[in-house]
Amino acid sequence: MIISSANDYREAARRRVPPFMFHYADGGSFSERTLERNVTDLADLALRQRVLKDMSQLDTEIELFGEKLAMPAVLAPVGACGMYARRGEVQAAQAAENKGIPFTLSTVSICPIEEVTAAIKRPMWFQLYVLKDRGFMKHVLERAKAAGCSTLVFTVDMPTPGARYRDRHSGMSGDYKEIRRALQAVTHPFWAWDVGIKGKPHTLGNVSAYTGKAVGLDDYVVWLGENFDPSISWKDLEWIRDFWDGPMVIKGILDPEDAKDAVRFGADGIVVSNHGGRQLDGALSSARALPSIADAVKGDIKILADSGIRNGLDIVRMLALGADATMLGRAFVYALGAAGKAGVENMLDIFKKEMHVAMTLTSNQKISDITRDALVDLSKL
């Protein structure tokens, strides 16, 4: 099929990847209203077109936590990327490096930290969940530190798992899931060969290294469910702040008061995020939550935003709402599932070209030029 956008990659991934993995990435929680609003609230923001400005020196580069980024985007942490393409985390990390942006490895990746860092030269970011097993948290932090990971992304919006009903229908969970997955693999032969056979092992590399035994997808669901910690508070994060030498980013902020707490805590950055609509259905979309958070803490802490970004125009919209940079999740997973490393590289090229168009036609020559003036207040029309 012809690929011209991230939406095309979604359709290509739907055809190529078995339903249990496609819907794991594509779905949200409960009735998926927040998942839907993440996309529509962002897309509904009208850009303010300005003309006859010299845009010949347009530049999408930024500096974030001491790193040069070719554009204000970071590949977000996504669990089990190695089930979308053969050793998928390695392929995605290499694509990000080639396009000049960071890659963030999930705690629950297929490829372990050391396998990914050995395949790239650029320091990657590492994401950690709040878990009851502090021994695991310390173990994986030590490994991330030893491997040269530059920035820690601490996800705080999962003290309990969201109700992802679509997973039960797709075969990711629920009755007879093993049989259903096997049948799906038979009907997706390219994936079965490239990922199912040549992409082994399909264990969670970081978790398996700690437990000393292979932890597969089914074990991972149980293990995570048992280890989510609803008692976590800011005080519990202090030892992590003390242990980690580099920048620390708190992911999962939707309220200005929580953003202020992150500043008081001493975090270097926050990610305005509702976990891609996979946790609390009915929560604000990131686009709706971002402006008040930016008003509260802009300049005191770096603000990243994710959830709902499907093209380069959406990146510009997030920046206009107050973000310093963005994180891309589903968009790169679709491209990874459809075409591996080459797909992710092409997707990032598409996003960058779309940013060029949006910046040119809103007359913003540099990323720092983009403010809310780039948006039209439709309520006044």
Swiss-Prot record:
InterPro entries per record: Aldolase_TIM, Alpha-hydoxy_acid_DH_FMN, FMN-dep_DH, FMN_HAD, FMN_hydac_DH_AS, LldD
Listed transmembrane segments: none
Boundaries of every FMN hydroxy acid dehydrogenase domain copy: 1-380
Active site: H275
Subcellular localization: Cell inner membrane
E.C. code: 1.1.-.-
Its membrane topology: Peripheral membrane protein
Gene Ontology cellular component terms for the protein in this record: plasma membrane
Similarity remark: Belongs to the FMN-dependent alpha-hydroxy acid dehydrogenase family.
Entry protein name: L-lactate dehydrogenase
Taxonomic source organism: Actinobacillus pleuropneumoniae serotype 5b (strain L20)
Gene name tied to this protein: lldD
